[in-house]
């Protein structure tokens, strides 16, 4: 049941990742035309990392086992979100929880916890880098560590609330899926037994 769902979700995510190529190229074009002030070096990082993350799942789906492909896609997505979060010109807030949300599609509560922990660590690292270039640090004289702690506390409260909701949702969804699967299996067994009793081939 979960294996079949994993394969289907992997296929869905590879299509989503391919569509993300458009968003990545749009960011790069906006940077090169001066709409966004990313800087040339950061723009190249977005371009290279973004295209690798967006394109490789469509290739690896032919070779990697479903579970390994799933972990690869979730890991790389969070890394890219972390890269975006380090820049002061990109507002990354609730997006840090995007990977745990994607993990919910697999109906595995343990996966939601694992992706949640990893995503939180990426968020903390990105906030540390990002907070060094905030207005308060550069112009108001507040210390980097002071701003880092303030931002991290705010993000953490928001993050914990969202993760608690996600975990409860995926637990309920998995239970419903298992109950439906059990009912379908029971009906199938009853049908097979009836065919054996009646000798019907229908």
Task: Enumerate the language-model features and the residues they cover.
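N-terminal juxtamembrane segment and adjoining first transmembrane helix
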Residues: 1-66
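Hydrophobic transmembrane alpha-helices
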Residues: 17-34, 72-94, 109-154, 164-167
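Membrane-interfacial segments
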Residues: 34-39, 64, 133-138, 169-181
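Membrane-embedded alpha-helical segments of multi-pass membrane proteins
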Residues: 47-49, 91-99, 153-157
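Membrane-interfacial loop-to-transmembrane alpha-helix junctions, especially the N-terminal start
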Residues: 67-71
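Juxtamembrane or sensor-core-proximal signal-transducing alpha helices
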Residues: 154-185
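Primarily the dimerization/phosphotransfer
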Residues: 183-202
